[in-house]
């Protein structure tokens, strides 16, 4: 029988890796909101690793800055989410956060074992900063968000623009809110996603995961965009990409996905469905024109 004070021969003072991980596990605070794709992938990694974390919801998409700490813009000059705080230190940018958490809490590992597979993982993740994330926002604003923003007063829209510190994001939003489905930026954004999904499908025809045989940060980083496009009722556009769809279902069936993504919901879900369905015929024509 285990008696008080017994440690079964283990000297925890000689387990610095264990004690360091245990010490930091309770110190994670995530600034995020429900439907942010960048925040979704960070939550997904936190749940896959079963790390305890404190939630601070800040809906920056709606101009909610009341809960941001005074030095938030020092942590992320763009003023966006997510930002994660660990033991007093702040880390911004979701892809950097994924790599940081993998370094800080390496078990269970979400990097493939071989150097080649790890390189492939990072090449997939690089696509996000090379255009996928900007394209995702363009599609979302053109299809759905423009209706939400245009319902506001001119004064509130100007205030919204004034709060945006990312010049590219502000300029794109101004074009996309004004032009909607006729935005000159929409065709290229849809083409970016069509190429991405087709490339993913081809890769997944040869391996179960994007970086090979191992579920990795690449899968976590990119799955949120399939969900985002599907939230606009656009899934029929890639119904023939069998391997992509099977991959998505495998991830969606993981307990971590339920707790990190599904359970947080989306306060704009109904708007996405209604405006997405209305936009589908024109979007489908643009999607096909890029074939």
Regions of interest found by a model, annotated:
Residues 1-13:
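Cationic, amphipathic, low-complexity segments that mediate targeting or membrane/lipid association
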Residues 6, 36, 232:
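Alpha-helical and His/Cys-centered functional microenvironments
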Residues 11-167, 287-291:
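GST-like domain detector, emphasizing the conserved glutathione-binding G-site
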Residues 32, 40, 64, 211, ...:
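C-terminal or late-domain output modules
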Residues 109-120, 141, 163-177, 259-276:
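A short, terminal or domain-edge coil/loop segment
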Residues 121-124, 147-152, 200-204, 268-287:
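Short flexible/disordered coil segments
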Residues 132-249, 253:
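GST-like fold's C-terminal all-alpha helical module
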């Amino acid at each position: 029988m285990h008696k008080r004070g017994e440690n079964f021969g283990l000297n925890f003072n000689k387990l610095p890796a264990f004690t360091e991980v245990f010490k930091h596990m309770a110190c994670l605070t995530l600034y995020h909101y429900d439907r942010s794709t960048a925040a979704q992938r960070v939550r997904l990694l936190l749940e896959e690793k079963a790390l305890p974390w404190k939630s601070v919801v800040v809906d920056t998409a709606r101009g909610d800055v009341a809960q941001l700490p005074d030095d938030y813009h020092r942590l992320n000059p763009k003023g966006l989410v997510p930002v994660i705080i660990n033991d007093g230190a702040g880390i911004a940018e979701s892809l950097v956060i994924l790599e940081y958490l993998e370094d800080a809490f390496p078990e269970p590992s979400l990097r493939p074992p071989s150097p080649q597979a790890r390189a492939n993982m990072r090449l997939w993740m690089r696509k996000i900063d090379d255009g996928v994330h900007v394209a995702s926002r363009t599609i979302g604003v053109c299809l759905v968000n423009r209706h939400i923003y245009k319902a506001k007063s001119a004064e509130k829209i100007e205030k919204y623009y004034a709060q945006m510190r990312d010049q590219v994001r502000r300029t794109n939003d101004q074009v996309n809110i004004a032009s909607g489905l006729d935005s000159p930026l929409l065709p290229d954004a849809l083409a970016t996603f069509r190429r991405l999904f087709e490339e993913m499908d081809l890769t997944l025809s040869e391996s179960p995961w994007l970086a090979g045989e191992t579920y990795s940060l690449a899968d976590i980083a990119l799955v949120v965009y399939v969900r985002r496009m599907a939230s606009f009722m656009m899934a029929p556009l890639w119904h023939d990409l069998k391997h992509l769809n099977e991959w998505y279902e495998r991830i969606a069936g993981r307990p971590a996905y339920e707790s990190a993504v599904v359970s947080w919901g989306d306060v704009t879900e109904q708007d996405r469905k209604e405006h997405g369905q209305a936009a589908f015929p024109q979007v489908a024509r643009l999607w096909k024109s890029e074939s």
